[in-house]
């Protein structure tokens, strides 16, 4: 999630009555393929259409290009087949540092089951000089 979040930063995560939404930063449990929880950004949720144009470096959800000022590197293609429509009960996530992020573009992570979402990262508490809400 570099530059939005860096390793060892401490976050407040909320999970009460949470439904994932596009653009949210979420903490995901290890699931079946991961050794530890990961932090990623929700790109598309169940029922939404998704297209990633790797040549133009653009992401489209429901036919509209999404504005991603937080992305810190070019989007590279992974080894996973990206579905045209996100299946029920799943979300598609990517990290903000797209060149090196292990996310839904890769089979190791793939589509995320909504039951594997720990919660939404709301607020950074450490380091002190970066305290604030996450958007």
Segments predicted by a language model, with ranges:
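Soluble "head" domains of membrane/secretory-pathway proteins
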Residues: 3-135
């Amino acid at each position: 999630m570099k530059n939005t979040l860096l390793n060892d930063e401490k976050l407040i995560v909320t999970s009460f009555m949470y439904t994932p939404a596009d653009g949210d930063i979420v903490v995901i449990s290890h699931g079946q393929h991961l050794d530890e929880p990961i932090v990623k950004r929700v790109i598309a949720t169940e029922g939404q259409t998704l297209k990633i144009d790797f040549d133009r470096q653009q992401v489209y959800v429901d036919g509209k290009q999404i504005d991603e000022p937080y992305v810190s590197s070019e989007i590279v293609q992974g080894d996973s087949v990206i579905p045209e429509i996100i299946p029920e009960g799943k979300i598609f996530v990517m990290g903000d540092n797209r060149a090196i992020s292990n996310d839904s573009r890769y089979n190791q992570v793939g589509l995320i089951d909504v039951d594997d979402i720990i919660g939404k990262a709301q607020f950074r508490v450490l380091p002190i000089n970066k305290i604030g809400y996450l958007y």
